[in-house]
Every structure is written in C-alpha cells, then in structure tokens.
C-alpha cells in the first residue's frame, strides 16, 4: 500500500509539472518569424490565383485549388455550402475555448487586366484568363487566409477552441453571402474576422476603427415606359426619354431639399439607355446605378425618395415606371464591434508599432457582403494597405490597372493571426 501511495504521489507531481496543451502564449516575435518563413508560400498562392480568376458562382477551379492546398496542410472538416460554390473548413483543437470565424472572398471580376499598373509601370505578371482579373485583391485575401490556416495548424497544440474558415463565393455579385449565412448559422461564433486589401491605404498599414468602415449599398434599376413612334411626329408618341431626364433632374433637386444632408448618401447614376436608331422614338428607357451610405436608415429613405420622384414625374409625362427586383437596399454598412476594434487596435499595434491607423479619411465607399456576418456574431473588418507609388500599385479597385504590393500581405497575415490567437484568451 505504501509503495502504491508513493507511485500515485509521483504521478500527481508529474502531471502538475506538465504544461497543459493549448495554454502556451505565442509571442509577437514567434508570430512575426513564422509569417516570414511562409513568405514564399504566400506569394506562390497569390500568384497562382491571380493567373486564374473566376467570377462569382463559377469559381470551380479556384475551389478545387483551395481544397487541395487545405488537404496538403492537414486534416479539416470541409463542408460545401448548398446552392453555392463556396465552402467552409473547421479546425477543432478539441479543447474548450472560443469559436472564431476567419473569412475570405474568392471571386474575380469580368475585366480584362492591363499589363501596366497605376503609375504606368509594367506589372510582373497578369491574369492568364483573358477578360477576367482579380482586380479587387481577392487573390491576396485567399493567400492571407491560406497562410494563416497553415500557421494555425502548425500551432494547433498551443491553441484552444475552434476555428471556422469561410471561403465565400460571389462577393462582387452578392450571390454567395446568404447561402453561406444559412450554412453556418448553427455554429455559435464568438467573433468573425475579415480583411480587405486597400489601394487607398499606404502599404504596410492596417486600418482599424470601430463603427462603420465600409459603406452599405442599394442598387438602382428602373424602366420608364411611354409610347414609341416615328420621330417626325412626336405628338403622336409619348417620349420616355424626356420623362427619364426629368426624373434625374428632379432627383438631383430633391437630393438637397428632401433628405437629411447630415447623413451622407452618394448617388451614382451609371446607366441610361433608350432607343436604337435616330428616327424612332423608343417605347422605354432604362436607368441604373447605385447608392452608397454609412447609415442604413438614410440609405433606405433615399431609395424611397428616388422611387417616389420617379413615379410622380413619370405620371406627369403620361408615362409609367417599373422598378427592377434588384432595386433594394441590398448590403448594410460594415460595422465593426467596438470591443473587438479596441482589442485589435491595441494588439496589432503591439505587433506592428506605427503601422496601424484609425484615420477616418480611409473610410471606404465601396460595399462588402462581410457586413451580413454580424447577424451571427460580433465582427471585425480591417483594411490592409497595398498602395506603393514606387512600385506603381496605386490604381483603384475594379480597374484594369489594379495591382498590389505583395510585401503588404505579411501585415494581413500577422493581423489575422494576432486577432485569432489572442482573441481566444479574451475574458467574456
């Protein structure tokens, strides 16, 4: 009995002196060194994806490539998203802890890429898919997330909780977000993080702020119907072009007199089509465009104002209006959780001193489907600067000349890793 007691005591001492898996703190130095060791991998992934962009709903080869790289890294639960080409993967440490979502978008744009960048310099490589490009940086987003996954997998014995990696298709067309939300709504997330490369932010800087960081979006799409006829007898027709132009003029007046001007909403009319030849009055005209806003209610009210003006002015011209099904407020502003933003700003500034900013001038009027993830959990979205005039990476997103400074990708990876690993230890 005495010998058994000694053995039991020694066993208890041994267990007490053994580090508990998942409790090790990852130092900033270790994190930065790890990111550096994967620099070649990050660039390789980004360049492959840049060569072969695919648009929303058709990212077949992109998804195949991403899943192949995940299988090379290790074992994950991989789930396809029903009704979508998107998917998500889970890394479960099987230890108690928080559940963190990390997201990337995966689609490209139907734009022919220019071999010349924003400063007139030749790009080192361009898309091999003619007519398509990663002109918004989604290739970089995927490279950031894959590298982050690789490092988290390497560190899995040091971590607690669960990571869910979200590969969202069709961000540009808003087609992938709702199927993704439906597919993951059963998961209890503690936080969801995403980032976006930004050509308006200096390379090597990470923009972090609480509140609205990217704009909400409403689509404009309507037809004005009159009665066509021969151009020589306009009195025998009802010309919808006059009605349509008066609608736009009246909207411009109402914009200043019937809206709360303290809440900025930008109005972009981008399409005006009517008629096919010079001597025929058309039956209809088409107007299209977009609204962008940082206040959801202001955006909705502005959309309703346009509909009212269009209906009333068309009626005054004996015309009618038909609004497109897509003419709705589709995406809310991206709103960062204050607690997460404060935490991230402090921890990422500690990782990259002098490389974080909260300057309001970097607010981006583009829209992001990431906004909808706040239906599931508190969210944080950061902008990673890629603007480098010396390299020529200054062109705006969605342009043929768009390019990125690949050196900036390390900051995106570091910020994502710092958030993901530190956030698991946040007290509730």
Model segments located where?
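Cleavable N-terminal signal peptides
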Residues: 9-10, 20-21
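Acidic/His- and Gly-rich active-site-bordering loop/insert found
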Residues: 24-134, 139-160
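Divalent metal-coordination and catalytic microenvironments
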Residues: 49, 89, 102, 138, ...
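Histidine/acidic-residue-rich, glycine-tolerant segments that coordinate divalent metal ions
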Residues: 109, 123-133, 139-140, 152-282
């Amino acid at each position: 009995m005495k010998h058994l007691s000694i053995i039991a005591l020694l066993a208890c001492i041994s267990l007490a002196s053994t580090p508990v898996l998942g409790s090790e703190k990852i130092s900033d130095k270790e994190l930065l060194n790890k990111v550096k060791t994967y620099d070649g991998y990050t660039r390789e992934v980004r360049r492959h994806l840049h060569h072969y962009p695919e648009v929303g709903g058709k990212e077949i080869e992109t998804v195949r490539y991403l899943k192949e790289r995940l299988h090379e890294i290790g074992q994950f639960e991989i789930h396809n998203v029903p009704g979508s080409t998107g998917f998500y993967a889970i890394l479960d440490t099987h230890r108690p802890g928080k559940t963190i979502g990390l997201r990337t978008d995966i689609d490209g744009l139907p734009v022919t890429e220019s071999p010349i960048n924003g400063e007139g310099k030749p790009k080192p490589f361009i898309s091999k898919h003619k007519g398509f490009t990663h002109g918004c940086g989604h290739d970089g987003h995927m490279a950031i997330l894959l590298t982050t996954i690789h490092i988290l997998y390497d560190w899995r014995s040091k971590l607690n909780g669960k990571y869910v990696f979200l590969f969202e298709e069709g961000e540009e067309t808003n087609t992938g977000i709702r199927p993704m939300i439906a597919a993951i709504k059963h998961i209890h997330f503690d936080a969801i993080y995403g980032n976006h490369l930004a050509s308006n932010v200096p390379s090597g800087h990470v923009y972090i702020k609480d509140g609205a960081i990217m704009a909400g979006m409403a689509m404009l799409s309507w037809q004005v119907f009159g009665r066509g006829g021969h151009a020589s007898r306009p009195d025998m027709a009802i010309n919808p072009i006059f009605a349509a132009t008066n609608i736009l003029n009246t909207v411009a007046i109402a914009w200043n007199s019937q809206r709360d001007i303290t809440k900025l909403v930008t109005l972009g009319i981008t399409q005006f089509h009517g008629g096919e030849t010079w001597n025929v009055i058309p039956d209809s005209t088409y107007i299209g465009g977009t609204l962008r806003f940082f206040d959801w209610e202001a955006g909705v009210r502005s959309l309703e104002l346009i509909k009212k003006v269009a209906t009333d002015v068309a009626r005054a011209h004996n015309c009618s209006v038909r609004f497109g099904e897509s003419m709705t407020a589709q995406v809310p502003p991206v709103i960062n959780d204050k607690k997460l933003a404060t935490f991230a700003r402090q921890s990422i500034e500690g990782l990259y001193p002098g490389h974080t900013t909260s300057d309001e001038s970097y607010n981006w009027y583009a829209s992001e489907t990431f906004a909808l993830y706040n239906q599931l959990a508190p969210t944080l979205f950061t902008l990673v600067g890629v603007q480098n005039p010396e390299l020529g990476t200054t062109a705006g997103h969605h342009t043929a000349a768009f390019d990125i400074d690949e050196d900036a990708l390390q900051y995106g990876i570091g910020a994502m890793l710092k958030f993901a690993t530190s956030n698991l230890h946040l007290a509730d």
